[in-house]
Amino acid sequence: MARTDDDTWDLATSVGATATMVAAGRARATRDGLIDDPFAEPLVRAVGVDFFTRWAAGELDAADVDVPGAAWGMQRMTDMITARTRYIDAFFAEAGAAGIRQVVILASGLDARAYRLPWPAGTTVFEIDQPRVLEFKAATIAQLGAEPTAPVRAVAVDLRHDWPSALRQAGFDVGRPAAWAAEGLLGFLPPQAQDRLLDNVTALSADGSQLVAEVFANTGASGDALNAAGEKWRRHGLDVALDDLGFPGERNDPASYLQQLGWQPVRTPLNQMLANNGLPLQSTEPGAPFAQNYYCTAVLNKAG
C-alpha cells in the first residue's frame, strides 16, 4: 500500500516494521560479534514479528531467506547495518569529545544508544518518534531492568508535524551545540518534508553542531532489488513491500542542501564504509542498486 503524507504505524507495520528489521540486523550482528547492542534482540522479540525474531536469533540463514547473489536481502541488510552502526557510534563519540552534550536521534525507532553508549557526563539524549514507538521501547527496556547511560527525553511527535516546538518544550537548548542523527530516515520522508527537516535542524542548531545522515537513493534498480527480496520473504510469512514505503519524485541531495544552509558536509560512500569494516561490497556497475548511497557528516558554521 502506498504511503500517504499523514500515515501512522506501529513497529510491526509499514515504516515501523523497518525499524524492527534494522533492530533484527543489529541483533544478528551482535550475535556475530560485529557490534555490541544487547537490547536489539529483546526489542525484536517483544515486537513479535516471527520472521525478524528468527533472523535476530540466528534461526534463519541467508540461504533460507535471500536470493543468492542479490543486491539486497537480510544478510546484505545486516552487513549495511553493521557498518552504519559503527559509523554512527563513532560519530557520537567524536561529538562528545568535541564537547557536545545535546544529542537528538530523529525517528529513533528501536535505537538503544541512550542505554548502550558511554555518554560523557552532562549529556542529554532526545529521542523523537511517534508516540506508540517510544512508549513500546521504553516499556520493553524497563522490563529488562536497564538504566540509560544519560538522561533520556522522549519527544513523542511525528517528524512531519511541529516537532521543533515539542523538542524545545522537552528542554532542548537552541543556544548550545547538538549532535543530530538521521539514520535510515530521509528516504522515508516526502521530498519537501526532507528539506523542511534539514531547515528545522539548521534553525535549531548553534554553531559547532554536528549532523550524521544516511542518504538512500530511491532509484528504480534499488526498488527492484527491494521487491525481489520481499517476494522470497513472503514465503516465510513476512509481507512488507519495502519499495512502497518511500515517496517518489525528485529530491534535493542532502549534502548539497546542507552546504547551502551553512553546514560543511563530508560524504562517505556506502562501499567505503563496507570496505572499512571488511564487509562485502555492493556492485559499482552503472545503475546498480544502492550504488549512489552514501553517509554524510556535517558541522554547522553559520558565520562561515
UniProtKB/Swiss-Prot annotation:
Residues annotated as binding S-adenosyl-L-methionine: D129, D158, L159
One Pfam assignment: LCM
Domain of life: Bacteria
Keyword terms, alphabetized: Methyltransferase, S-adenosyl-L-methionine, Transferase
Keyword S-adenosyl-L-methionine: yes
InterPro entries found in the cross-reference section: Ppm1/Ppm2/Tcmp, SAM-dependent_MTases_sf, SAM_mthyl_Trfase_ML2640-like
Listed EC numbers: 2.1.1.-
GO BP, sorted A to Z: methylation
GO MF term list: methyltransferase activity
UniProt KW Transferase keyword: yes
Positions in coiled-coil regions: none
Function, in words: Exhibits S-adenosyl-L-methionine-dependent methyltransferase activity.
Similarity comment: Belongs to the UPF0677 family.
Protein's name according to its UniProt entry: Putative S-adenosyl-L-methionine-dependent methyltransferase MAV_4236
Protein's organism: Mycobacterium avium (strain 104)
